[in-house]
């Protein structure tokens, strides 16, 4: 039984990678996915490193209630700096780039054609409260799939 992706990809022109069971926010993952889709791997890695450094924010077009406005986003106002999810996305892109290089493609120039996070479940946790009680304080577990395509193969 192999790993199933949500879309079909031509193995001759694409490289794939997937993050499995990562404790990152699904909402942050969705925002990052929308921001990096369509970019080359080099552009996306540079963008995510700027997000981690706090120089560039990720636009939150969905799940943006109470999210502060950022002046560095063109055409949108709400944005954040999802540090933890950005680090995991960098690992995903590095893995996908290396898979593309192994297939004989130029890894940094490959285009991100598909990136999709999926909620897998929750890891149970407890938060202590007053009078000896405890409340559920669960952590979201996500899978993220990524497909890169060789730009010369689409021409």
Q: Where would I find each of the regions flagged by the language model?
A:
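Low-complexity, polar-biased intrinsically disordered regions enriched in Pro/Ser/Thr/Gly
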Residues: 72-78, 124-132
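Ribosome large-subunit tunnel/peptidyl-transferase-proximal elements
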Residues: 2-106, 147-148
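Extended, charged amphipathic interaction segments
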Residues: 107-130
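Generic structural signal for short, solvent-exposed loop/turn connectors between secondary structure elements
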Residues: 106-107, 155
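C-terminal edge-of-domain segments
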Residues: 132-155
């Amino acid at each position: 039984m192999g790993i199933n992706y949500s879309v079909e990809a031509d193995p001759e022109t694409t490289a794939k990678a997937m993050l499995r069971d990562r404790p990152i926010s699904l909402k942050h993952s969705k925002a990052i996915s929308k921001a990096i889709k369509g970019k080359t791997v080099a552009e996306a890695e540079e963008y995510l490193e700027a997000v981690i450094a706090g120089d560039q924010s990720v636009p939150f077009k969905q799940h943006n209630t109470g999210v502060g406005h950022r002046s560095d986003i063109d055409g949108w106002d709400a944005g954040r700096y999802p540090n933890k999810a950005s680090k995991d996305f960098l690992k995903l892109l590095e893995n996908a780039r290396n898979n593309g290089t192994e297939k004989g493609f130029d890894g940094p120039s490959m285009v991100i054609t598909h990136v999709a996070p999926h909620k897998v479940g929750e890891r149970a946790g407890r938060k202590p409260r007053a009078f000896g009680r405890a409340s559920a304080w669960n952590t979201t577990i996500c899978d993220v799939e990524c497909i890169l395509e060789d730009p010369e193969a689409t021409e």
